[in-house]
Regions:
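N-terminal intrinsically disordered/low-complexity leader segments
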Residues: 1-16, 80-87, 213
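C-terminal peripheral helix-coil segments that are non-catalytic and often amphipathic
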Residues: 1-6, 95-106, 110, 138-154, ...
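Generic hydrophobic, amphipathic alpha-helix propensity
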Residues: 17-26, 42, 67-71, 75, ...
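Helix-turn-helix
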Residues: 20, 28-62, 66
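Short hydrophobic clusters on alpha-helical segments that form packing/core surfaces
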Residues: 21-29, 104, 205
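Hydrophobic alpha-helical connector segments
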Residues: 66, 79-113, 162-169
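Short, flexible, glycine-rich and Lys/Arg-enriched loop motifs at helix boundaries
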Residues: 69-93, 179-193
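Short secondary-structure transition hinges
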Residues: 88-90, 105-143, 188-191
Length: 213
């Protein structure tokens, strides 16, 4: 079944309409937050009726889950395990952390809208924040923490709670992205490429946790 687009003439399939509503919802949520955005406003911006929004997403919770699923399945998704797979197989610590840092920085640069949306969700104590934590953040800690633990057993890295190492690593990357996207978009404090940032952050981390020969 198809419906007519707001512009008239062209017709949009159900899945295309669903994606359009999702994109509009992400845009509005990232600008106004969740409390400041109604389904009526989403419908108006998407050029559909509010009933059409609920036809595709029966509840707001279903819409939030669809947003995460849409981001996870998009072509520019950030999959740490896949991104670092080759370096992990070679036990290349520099390659692991540098590839992950660069991948995350590029992802944040290409999708600042989703980063703003996640900040809104956390500040408003919105359920999307917990959904994102469970679906992504927790998995990153488990995956990267597991690699660090293995390298500690092999004597390559010093003994330290792997969660602390992961927290420090993510902290450097996230702070840099937040500065570039939100606080200092003109990059007056620090203006370096993502490649350079990833390299230097990896230097700092490995100089702190590598076992000196």
């Amino acid at each position: 079944m198809t419906v007519e687009s707001p512009a008239g003439g062209a017709r949009m399939a159900g899945e295309e309409r669903r994606l359009q509503i999702l994109r509009v919802a992400v845009s509005l949520f990232s600008e106004r937050g969740f409390r400041g955005t109604t389904t009526k406003e989403i419908a108006h911006a998407a050029g559909v009726s509010e009933a059409m929004v609920f036809r595709h997403f029966a509840t707001k919770e279903e819409l939030y889950a669809a947003i995460l699923d849409h981001k996870a399945c998009s072509g520019d998704r950030f999959e740490p395990a896949e991104m670092a797979a080759d370096a992990i197989s070679r036990k290349d610590d520099r390659g692991v952390f540098e590839s992950l840092a660069l991948g995350a920085l590029n992802h944040h640069e290409n999708d600042p809208e989703f980063q703003r949306l996640l900040l809104h969700s956390a500040l408003e104590k919105h359920e999307l924040a917990q959904m994102f934590f469970d679906e992504f953040v927790r998995r990153v800690y488990e995956f990267l923490g597991g690699y660090i633990r293995e390298r500690q057993r092999e004597g390559a890295l010093i003994e330290m709670d792997p969660a602390i190492v992961v927290r420090c690593f993510i902290g450097m990357v996230m702070h840099h992205s937040l500065n570039n996207n939100l606080w200092d978009p003109r990059r007056r404090l620090l203006n370096i490429s993502n490649e350079s940032a990833a390299e230097h952050f990896t230097d700092i981390l490995l100089n702190g946790i590598s076992r000196k020969s």
